[in-house]
Amino acid sequence: MKNEKRKTGIEPKVFFPPLIIVGILCWLTVRDLDAANVVINAVFSYVTNVWGWAFEWYMVVMLFGWFWLVFGPYAKKRLGNEPPEFSTASWIFMMFASCTSAAVLFWGSIEIYYYISTPPFGLEPNSTGAKELGLAYSLFHWGPLPWATYSFLSVAFAYFFFVRKMEVIRPSSTLVPLVGEKHAKGLFGTIVDNFYLVALIFAMGTSLGLATPLVTECMQWLFGIPHTLQLDAIIITCWIILHAICVACGLQKGGRIPSDVRSYLSFLMLGWVFIVSGASFIMNYFTDSVGMLLMYLPRMLFYTDPIAKGGFPQGWTVFYWAWWVIYAIQMSIFLARISRGRTVRELCFGMVMGLTASTWILWTVLGSNTLLLMDKNIINIPNLIEQYGVARAIIETWAALPLSTATMWGFFILCFIATVTLVNACSYTLAMSTCREVRDGEEPPLLVRIGWSILVGIIGIVLLALGGLKPIQTAIIAGGCPLFFVNIMVTLSFIKDAKQNWKD
């Protein structure tokens, strides 16, 4: 038994508790779906109304932290002594592919409809004002602010991993400067790690819960195969198998090649939509939306709507900030891993500038296309959602484009590869966080990574069985609460240690 543990490298205190907790929650959910939905609604209401303001302040403070890194004393510090492991182009593509997935294609195609039909600031639904502000809010939720949060934590983890030469990558390992070695490696650190892992597992499950219906609806459109929960389960199984093949190739091949393919295909598909949908309108709408964003930015940053209580900031801004918070550590660990040898300023600028440009292009093109289809009465999104669900409405926004069959094939392949790259990045981090010893330059065990991807697939199926967007939103928001505090502790620990040990 001792030799087996040494071979697999599993750390029992952070490997088994998340398995047990997630297993119990899944069993309770499947046992009574109606009761689970009641609990989900109560949790969503409590967290968004009681803690929404904290998420908004957190994002603002982290933005100031990004400026401090870029222009402060650590800007020219190098994260490791080696040259960069990946070319700049592959580095940017890997970041883009790992931080986005079919879940992003999901929101990019439909988000603007929700903003227009239930707008903020007391605007009339479907009014001119609501349409003018629709894309601006997407640019806000998927712009520099959240990417700055990721870049700050990526610097922190790269510092601990490559500069301080820490052997284990998990949140508790970075807290030694803040709480001391006794607490970081004791019960407190174990609790922190388990909170992180449970939240991350459910976050990954929500991404699969959003991505899978898109693929199955594509299959129904292309092949006439009825969309069922069983088909969703088959698709998730295919993702896990393909992920295992990628992992067997190692991070260099298994991670970079699908990421590059996914990125090139993304821009190819977006270019097609841009050309055939209406390039002039898209550019005009984007330009106007940037102006709206700049005009409303202070209100957006601190909008909680405590008087009118319309629910927009709770349902969207708080939800998205929780989305970014819950993925921040996991993605920052992965991004730190592929950023060895780069300077702090290079990492911060590369992430914020490159990834903001990528997400802004995606949301502008897809959101503008959806708005045009609605205004021209080509598709009726409310009816599609009511009769068939959100995924069908999204598919119809793509099927309405010229050369619909070729377009749908491209979208189908893109969604499939996009989710493989996401599962690859997430399972890598889960395996790193639950192994006893993964030294600099080593990869976590193959079976551990595959095992985590299987568990995440089960979570995705459970969320799909619940139905609707609310369970997915609640899973993100509830998981974001404990990680909100963990992220703050990691940030403070990095600042404290860097001041003492990262001097000229």
From Swiss-Prot:
Pfam families: BCCT. Its main location: membrane. GO terms for cellular component: plasma membrane. PANTHER family: HIGH-AFFINITY CHOLINE TRANSPORT PROTEIN-RELATED (PTHR30047), L-CARNITINE_GAMMA-BUTYROBETAINE ANTIPORTER (PTHR30047:SF11). The gene is caiT. Pathway: Amine and polyamine metabolism; carnitine metabolism. It comes from Shigella flexneri serotype 5b (strain 8401). It is found in: Cell inner membrane. It is a multi-pass membrane protein. This is L-carnitine/gamma-butyrobetaine antiporter. Keywords: Antiport, Cell inner membrane, Cell membrane, Membrane, Transmembrane, Transmembrane helix, Transport. Catalyzes the exchange of L-carnitine for gamma-butyrobetaine. Belongs to the BCCT transporter (TC 2.A.15) family. CaiT subfamily. The chain crosses the membrane at residues 10-30, 51-71, 92-112, 143-163, 195-215, 231-251, 263-283, 316-336, 347-367, 398-418, 446-466, 475-495. One of its GO terms (biological process) is 4-(trimethylammonio)butanoate transport. InterPro entries: BCCT_CS, BCCT_transptr, BCCT_transptr_CaiT. Homotrimer. GO terms for molecular function: (R)-carnitine:4-(trimethylammonio)butanoate antiporter activity.
